[in-house]
Regions:
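Active-site nucleotide/adenylate-binding loops and adjacent lid/helix of ATP-dependent enzymes
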Residues: 4, 80-162, 167, 214, ...
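Conserved N-proximal alpha/beta basic substrate-recognition cap immediately N-terminal to
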Residues: 9-104
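Protein kinase-like catalytic core scaffold
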Residues: 121, 162, 184-185, 232, ...
Length: 293
């Protein structure tokens, strides 16, 4: 059996997962074309396709994950899960349908009227990451100016923008790492001085969490289950009343040893994914036997 992480670009997280063997099994990294050429029925593939640096879509490779599944490869983080994580409009619709706390979301497109605001909002790309092109608008005039400013961007012309209710910033968020319906790690991300966004790419810093809040973990697991993801980062914001709001999901989440002071986060993640793949293969085999009986 081969275990493969399917990604278009190398990343420190994928390198660390490759080093985290599970018994006699170990991971390798393949791009979508290599995966199609090498993986066969009974192998395992984990989709690690990310959003594009240009913010106008996803890495090219969902087609390969679909073809691998049709071939009999066990695919974790399949095309539907990755799209649901990376497409913020789809994320919002799924979470709303499952009644999981998430900011009110509106889709801005060329020619569509600007909504009437009930409070501050955030404008961001539909396929965004790293805090890039994320704009806070405290009133209707700021929203109009922002939408006028981004209308020439390639990402806006292709997909429009997401306008979301602003969850009042408290200077930090909680990123929970979920693997196979288990919390395997978490960190607080603390915003840089004078910055309301918590992204590390914008100067935010990670703070280890020795004991992730139980409610936050349950919300993160439910969000991962809602989109069908086997490995996902769930960004949570405190709602000011003791609860948590799902801000975003990351289907190609990057993480470090800071995410888990109580165990080796890469070994735990690797083991959780392998066990999930074995469980899924067992269920598929039982279903096939029942059909043949």
């Amino acid at each position: 059996m081969r275990l493969a992480l399917i990604a278009c670009r190398p990343s420190p997280t994928n390198v660390a997962l490759v080093r985290a063997s599970f018994g006699d099994l170990s991971w390798e990294t393949l791009d979508p074309h290599e995966a199609l050429a090498n993986l066969r029925s009974g192998d395992v593939a984990v989709g690690r396709l990310d959003v594009l640096p240009t913010l106008d879509g996803m890495d090219d490779g969902l087609w390969a994950l679909g073809a691998l599944a049709a071939r009999g490869v066990t695919v974790l983080n399949d095309p539907a899960a990755l799209l649901a994580a990376h497409d913020k409009l789809l994320t919002a619709r799924i979470l709303r349908r499952r009644e999981i706390a998430h900011p009110w979301t509106w889709h801005s497109r060329p020619g569509r009227p600007v909504p009437r605001l009930l409070g501050p909002v955030v404008v961001k790309p539909r396929f965004g990451s790293w805090g890039h092109e994320v704009h806070r608008c405290d009133d209707a005039d700021a929203l109009r100016r922002t939408l006028e400013r981004v209308q020439g961007a390639a990402w806006y012309r292709r997909h429009g923008a997401i306008v979301q209710e602003l969850v009042h910033p408290q200077g930090y968020d909680l990123r929970v790492l979920v693997a196979a319906r288990r919390v395997v790690g978490a960190v607080h991300r603390v915003a840089a001085p004078g910055e309301w966004r918590t992204n590390v790419a914008l100067g935010g810093v990670r703070r280890p969490v020795t004991d992730p809040p139980l409610e936050a973990g349950l919300v993160a697991i439910e969000a991962a289950r809602a989109i069908g993801a086997s490995l996902v980062g769930v960004d949570l914001l405190p709602d000011g009343f003791g609860g948590w709001v799902v801000a975003e999901l990351n289907g190609a989440v990057e993480f470090t040893h800071e995410y888990a002071a109580w165990h080796d986060v890469f070994a735990e993640t690797s083991g959780a994914l392998v066990r999930e793949a074995f469980d899924r293969q067992g269920r598929d085999l039982a279903l096939e036997r029942s059909r043949l009986a």
